[in-house]
Amino acid sequence: MLTSTLLALASAALASAHTVITYPGWRGNNLKDNEEFPYGMQWTYPCGGLTLTQNRTYWPTTGGAISFQPGWFQGHATAFIYVNLGIGNDGPDGGPKNMSFPMVSPFQIIGPGKNPYPGTFCLPQVSTPAGFEFKEGDNATIQLVELAIHGAALYSCVDITFVPPGDPRVAQVNESNCFNSTDLGAADLYTINILESGRDRLALTSAAASLARMAGWVPLVAGGLWLML
């Protein structure tokens, strides 16, 4: 009984997290649930339960904008964002074999709260992965991963075809499809905010440094517990 209850709670958490890619396009609507995905689609690797689309979006060979809305459902007070590229047509569904090539350094988004919220986050110029050169007509898939606060990874994709910069087939980037909402913030992935004792200001410290300090407490705690035995 307890196991089934925990599974239901975990499934509810998974179903509560959704992201929409607003530019350059979107593989398709995976905000829904159905018999195959009773708790929602977006937790399914690699593209949130959707197979390759033939309705590809044109994107410059030198890179371009990516815009998304991270807070469609609850559970996004904070989240980690990853943007990856899958290359080619050799995968099982005619798309990439994997999504192994990072396009940006992972970062954290900070929303206004845990409840659903409107808001758009824009990366105005995302380069193609280092070491790759693409030519007109090459196919790829951009994968957006949102690691939500409850621990679930949510996946959305857009299938692209590369074209030269300035090609008129590339959708125009403007203030309506690529902008940063004022109630959304961003931070380095491994940076946290702490309030220093006796001071009314926030200081930034790395998570690694925090873990190092915690490691120093472990022998003291262990010794205290041993004395209590």
From Swiss-Prot:
Membrane topology category: Lipid-anchor; GPI-anchor
Cited Pfam families: BIM1-like_dom
One Gene Ontology molecular-function label: metal ion binding
Chain segments annotated as coiled-coil in the UniProt record: none
Record keyword Manganese present: no
Disruption of the gene: reported phenotype: Leads to alteration in cell fusion between conidial anastomosis tubes. Displays reduced basal MAK-1 activity.
Source taxon at top rank: Eukaryota
Cofactor note: Binds 1 copper ion per subunit.
Signal sequence segment: 1-17
Cofactor requirements of the protein: Cu(2+)
Residues excised as propeptide: 207-229
Disulfide bonds: 47-157, 122-178
InterPro entries: BIM1-like, BIM1-like_dom
Keyword annotations of the record: Cell membrane, Copper, Disulfide bond, Glycoprotein, GPI-anchor, Lipoprotein, Membrane, Metal-binding, Signal
Residues where lipid is bound covalently (GPI-anchor amidated serine): 206
GO cellular component, one term: plasma membrane
PANTHER family assigned: COPPER ACQUISITION FACTOR BIM1-LIKE DOMAIN-CONTAINING PROTEIN (PTHR34992:SF10), HYPHAL ANASTAMOSIS-7 PROTEIN (PTHR34992)
Function statement: Lytic polysaccharide monooxygenase-like protein that has diverged to biological functions other than polysaccharide degradation since it does not perform oxidative cleavage of polysaccharides. Acts as the major cell wall sensor that regulates MAK-1-dependent hyphal anastomosis, the fusion of hyphal cells. May also act as a cell surface-bound protein that functions in the copper-accumulation pathway.
UniProt protein name: Lytic polysaccharide monooxygenase-like protein ham-7
Name of the gene encoding the protein in the UniProt record: ham-7
